[in-house]
Amino acid sequence: MDITDIRIKKVDSKNSGSKLLAYVAVTFDNCLVLHNIRVIKGQKGVFIAMPNRRTRVGEYKDIVHPISQDFRKALQTSIFKEYIRENPADLELELDF
C-alpha cells in the first residue's frame, strides 16, 4: 500500500499553548483516505497520534492504527517530511525520521 497524498492543516498552537501542531489526512493508493491524524509536540519530541474516540467510561481508543512498527515508522516519516516541506520555519522541532 503506497501513500499517494498527504494533506496537512497546521494549527496555530503558539497563541493557544496547545501541543497540537497539525491535523493530517493521508491517502493510500488513491482509494482510501485516513483523516484526523494529529501531529503533537510532546516532552520527548514530535509524534503522530492516530484518530481516536472517547468511550463511555472516558478512555480514548484508536479507531485505526498501524499493526507493525515498520509501517508506523514509514507513515510518521512521510508525514514529517511533508510537514517540514510545507513549514520550513519549524525545522527546529525534534522530528524522529
Curated annotation (Swiss-Prot):
Family annotation (InterPro entries): SpoVG, SpoVG_sf
Lineage: superkingdom: Bacteria
UniProt keyword Cytoplasm present: no
Alphabetical keyword list: Cell cycle, Cell division, Septation
GO biological process, one term: division septum assembly
Cited Pfam families: SpoVG
Sequence similarity: Belongs to the SpoVG family.
Annotated HAMAP family: SpoVG
Job of this protein: Could be involved in septation.
Name of the protein this chain belongs to: Putative septation protein SpoVG
Organism: Borreliella burgdorferi (strain ATCC 35210 / DSM 4680 / CIP 102532 / B31)
